[in-house]
Amino acid sequence: MATKFPKFSQGLAEDPTTRRIWYGIATAHDFESHDGMTEESLYQKIFASHFGQLAIIFLWTSGNLFHVAWQGNFEQWGQDPLHVRPIAHAIWDPHFGQPAVEAFTRGGAAGPVNISYSGVYQWWYTIGMRSSNDLYTGALFLLVGAAILLFAGWLHLQPKFQPSLSWFKNAESRLNHHLAGLFGVSSLAWTGHLVHVAIPESRGQHVGWDNFLTTLPHPAGLAPFFNGNWSVYAQNPDSASHLFGTSTGAGTAILTFLGGFHPQTQSLWLTDMAHHHLAIAVVFILAGHMYRTNFGIGHSMREILEAHRAPSGRLGLGHKGLFDTVNNSLHFQLGLALASLGVITSLVAQHMYSLPPYAFMAQDFTTMSALYTHHQYIAGFIMTGAFAHGAIFFIRDYDPIQNEGNVLARMLEHKEALISHLSWVTLFLGFHTLGLYVHNDVMLAFGTPEKQILIEPVFAQWIQASHGKALYGFDVLLSSADSPATSASQSIWLPGWLDAINSSSNSLFLTIGPGDFLVHHAIALGLHTTTLILVKGALDARGSKLMPDKKDFGYSFPCDGPGRGGTCDISAWDAFYLAVFWMLNTIGWTTFYWHWKHLALWQGNAAQFNESSTYLMGWLRDYLWLNSSQLINGYNPFGMNSLSVWAWMFLFGHLVWATGFMFLISWRGYWQELIETLAWAHERTPLANLVRWKDKPVALSIVQARLVGLAHFSVGYVFTYAAFVIASTSGKFG
């Protein structure tokens, strides 16, 4: 007899209802809960799956390179990056009429194409790619890499090649190899690529597989390196009149500290970036030799943590017991990794626009908007995931005896203070921010705009001034000619930095006023509310006054009922579910702010943002409504244009989003009644009743219905705003 899905759970496979299918899907990746799973097997399966993950990433990137090389216009774009629109790939659609064919035939293409808003053209150009052949070579290399990784994944599932549990638990060796190898050597390799390939290409000298071993990246060769005269590599940098990709105005330096941006490309100097990666490589390769392994020298993580005890005694036993707690809990490790990755992803969003690393990207406004929005949303989802796995750790892996008296136990012991403080902060921020906005709305509605409460962000302006922004007239640190900070850096990076920070042609330290002050606090409200829900969910995951035995019910449970009132909606999963709504809310406000501020600056109309952002109607009318008008009228009986696909996606996104509410508002009983009625009708309908099923139809649990609702809400939300950002920006700037 064929075994039924799911093979990993005998109990579910024997369930006579459709629960078998839905719970099977829901627990497919919860490896810990699978039949016969041992700790060693769990680690081995996860380890092997990493190779598959990397293979998928390589395959995807290979596909990007291949399609641009085959159907794109990379070489034409390289001739004139500011005026040629980069093509992502061709479109073949049997539904296209002649108007659509004409509308989507752009960028010098022969037929309909999609425009690239991902920044890959700028990235590939910056790192030294110039021809479609370069792209094909990269695609082929990644394809081979993906095949090798798939083989490695298969290999590590074979008994002879499965690492042992002790290998996975060897934290010091892993740290050394990841720090020195993963971060250090890869940064060194990237420095090598920048110095040997990207910098010469930026100066009009081609370097390829045919000549990279014979082309010196610097006229002096390696002599200055060996005789300690390293400053030679920083002499004669590219001049301010350098034309990127040509020898006009080019220098010979390879490792510099110029500061600021290349005047033509408005991106960071390639030689500065090479220097940065070299420094990172040195630091991480050193760090990768710090931990004690076979040779009995270096740090022991366990000893460091055991020794971490506050002299005052106010932190109890400090970090005692944390080494084993972290090292034996995959959820703890995943939580830490996701929290770090979430922060880094948000920093990427921030730095990608304020310090653009890729040539000509800063002048491609739609790409800048898309990349900021994309990375902030990704960061939001990753950060909520960090707290989800933190909560699962507390339920499944936390050992109260092993952690008695240490900082982790003390976190749990004073959780009421943490949660109530977060609650106080959110109430304060919410009432005051909304109060200011609403007051200003009322003043405008009553015809007295001069009675608005407008607060200058003086502290933030002071911080900007201390970094060298002269506009506000604060005479402090880098904005003061007499400051030691100014004189110390005068001969190296400071002139380039000061030029950049005081220039109106980039997004470095934008001028801020009362509108920024208000939206900053609105975003702070969103961040603190999201944090409150997530922190409360994790700290109450093991139990609360209302439900002291909560941990016995697992991570996600609908209720302990009937008969035990108030236990619905308090699982740690429910906290995650609620937090995602607030996270989306917050990222929405953040991206609205970024996008509107930049639209105003790019259009040379900063006053629009400054005047309209101080009251809510301004946001609704002058940002959302004004910029969605093209989308709302994107296609009609009289015709369509190249924005019509975004107009349709805008509509479709709203529909997906609205579908979410159907699952969020109606609960299990409604669906059970509906399903039973539909099953009755199906069995009595000719032809339809030829299709039978053995499983008794059972509605999803409340938790699963909430998941379906949340998924639709999130996907619809993201689709709607993606279409809005791309269409409203590309509609104005091309």
Curated annotation (Swiss-Prot):
Sites where the protein binds chlorophyll a B1: H654
Superkingdom, taxonomy of origin: Eukaryota
Pfam (any one): PsaA_PsaB
Residues reported in the UniProt entry to bind phylloquinone: W671
Cellular component, GO, one term: photosystem I
Binding positions for [4Fe-4S] cluster per the UniProt entry: C559, C568
Membrane topology field: Multi-pass membrane protein
Any one GO molecular-function label of the UniProt entry: electron transfer activity
Location within or outside the cell: Plastid, Chloroplast thylakoid membrane
Name under which the protein is recorded: Photosystem I P700 chlorophyll a apoprotein A2
Native organism: Nephroselmis olivacea (Green alga)
Species classification: Eukaryota, Viridiplantae, Chlorophyta, Nephroselmidophyceae, Nephroselmidales
Gene: psaB
